[in-house]
Amino acid sequence: GYDAARATFARLVGAKTEDVSMMPTCAVAISQLALGLPLEAGDEIVTWDQEYPSNAYPWYVAARKAGGRVVVVPSEADLRLDTDRLIAAIGARTRVVALSWVQYQTGAVTDLARVSEACRKVGALLAVDAIQGLGVMPFDMTALGVDAVTGGTQKWLAGPMGHGFLALRPGLRDLLEPIVHGAMTYGTFDDLTDPGRSPRHDPLRFEPGSPLLFGALGGAAAIEVLLDVGIDAIHAEALRLAAKLREGLLAHGARLLSAPLGDAPSPITTFLPRGDVGAAARRLSA
């Protein structure tokens, strides 16, 4: 059922069941997080320059509304991410560090444990979009010290398109104001309107209407298969295949843009073919 599905999502990311809210998409989950936080003038949000737009626009909007600013940390020339450079950007004004665990273009992986430690020192929140790693790489938000995790089911999880989730550390939920409101935000479908009622204090605080049954149940079924196989085993096989792919690409004169597998344990492989990229694209589409 729906509650069992919520528990499965919680197992995937190392959260408590009662701290996982179902969302229509990962982008909606990020927006709820960014726009629900009580930011103030002067607050800073630290992020990477490689972020997918859905993990950038909500934070820019949140900063603009509050009178804060987004601090963008640049990648290295070879597109690697220097965690030391990111940590150096975290300071007394930092309210949130918002980043992807695994970057969508390069597969670059951020050392979340180190970033979390830096966040704790200044009282900042660590918000992680984990969509590019969940299902193929082990993840435990509690062990890593992550405050909030967003994700979706359509990538490595091999689940339905159009379903996401928001997982929070215990105690963080009530700090966030719902950005979408409905009957379930405040009570049940059977309750009459009470203008003085406060939002709920459980996961339904961010689930305003009918339950997202198809996405939640389909996503949970896919996750259960992955958990039964074992994420560690899946990761090892994915890295083996990625190494074989990269070996073949290099043999054909391609230039790899992804970090070496030993530095960034994501199988995501990005490359430029030998010669004219446009010509290669035209040949493939012919």
Model-derived regions, located:
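Pyridoxal 5′-phosphate
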Residues: 1-286
